[in-house]
Regions:
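Juxtacatalytic substrate-recognition/specificity segment
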Residues: 59-174
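Short, cationic interaction patches enriched in Lys/Arg with P/S/T/G and frequent prolines
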Residues: 19-86
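Acidic/His/Gly-enriched intrinsically disordered linker/tail segments
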Residues: 129-139, 172-267
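Short, solvent-exposed loop/turn and secondary-structure capping segments
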Residues: 38, 118-121, 194-196, 264
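Bacterial N-terminal signal peptides
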Residues: 8-17
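Bacterial N-terminal signal peptides that target proteins for export
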Residues: 1-9
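Conserved beta-strand and immediately adjacent loop positions that scaffold enzyme active sites
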Residues: 24, 106, 181
Length: 267
């Protein structure tokens, strides 16, 4: 996979799946039926379709953001709102879920790690004090803290929003898929052409290192791992299952046929 693979999400007639940098070809068969494909076929006369996507007007949810002992700039607040809505939009338009079913969550942001950890301990979530953020299903709440790298805080929020969505609409999803999607949502962005994913540099490095050291779990074994054992391995911090899950989902999202497999898996 390329370092900066961008998976653009567009809708073109029957092509509901997102389109990468590949061109879209159109041709008419002998019966007058119009076909579309992202693969060039030299046996038929094709023409390249120039897609001109409309600007997104996605604004279905009113995102509630609460801060404790800190103040976000207007730009940061908007960045959070946009990021959350991008995640909702992705699940709705690409993974074909009805996002009106999703329970909007409240986002609580603490000024530092100490305040964040104290809050978790007070709510019997002490097991998660080493995390960057946490989604609390019973309270429909995402809790994070401002990290030294503030951009990482905003990525963490998108990560936890993904968990909130999956918990609501696909509670039976295997742990690797739940976490893999959340890892990729961190890298979800939008430009004039639509939604796209950047590669996750940290996960790419971890997986490459594990492969180099012979510690990378085989994909068949990885997919068969029960969710409870997967979570135990992830929480122990001794493996690379989280990074591998993120990279595998990244791989699945890179091509229309793989995305179709992912959609079927989740439905």
């Amino acid at each position: 996979m390329s370092v900066t693979l961008r998976t653009t999400v567009l809708v073109l007639l029957l092509l509901v799946a997102g389109l990468g940098h590949a061109k879209i070809y159109k041709w008419v068969d002998e019966h007058g039926k119009v076909h579309f494909s992202d693969r060039q076929d030299h046996s038929v006369k094709q023409e390249v379709v120039n897609v001109k996507p409309r600007a997104s007007k996605w604004s279905r949810f009113d995102i509630r953001i609460e801060t404790v002992d800190l103040e976000l700039t207007a730009e940061e607040n908007q960045q959070i709102v946009d990021g959350v809505n991008h995640v909702y939009e992705f699940f709705d338009r690409v993974l074909s879920f009805d996002m009106y079913r999703t329970v909007p969550v409240n986002i609580l942001i603490f000024k530092d790690m100490v305040s964040y950890r104290n809050y978790l301990i007070q709510r019997d979530r002490g097991w998660a004090v080493a995390s960057y953020g946490l989604y609390m299903p019973s309270e429909h709440q995402i809790v994070v803290y401002i990290q030294e790298d503030r951009e990482r805080t905003f990525r963490t929020i998108k990560h936890e929003v993904s968990h909130a969505v999956v918990d609501t609409i696909v509670p039976y999803a295997p742990a690797w898929l739940n976490e893999g999607l959340a890892e990729q949502m961190e890298m979800l962005e939008r430009d004039d052409s639509g939604l796209y994913f950047e590669s996750h540099p940290e996960n790419r490095w971890i997986v490459a290192k594990a492969r180099e050291q012979g510690r990378l779990t085989g994909i068949d074994q990885f997919l068969k791992l029960p969710s409870n054992k997967w979570r135990h391995s992830d929480m122990s911090g001794s493996g690379s299952v989280r990074a591998q899950a993120g990279q595998f989902v990244y791989f699945l999202l890179a091509k229309p046929t793989r995305r179709s497999f992912l959609v079927r898996l989740m439905h």
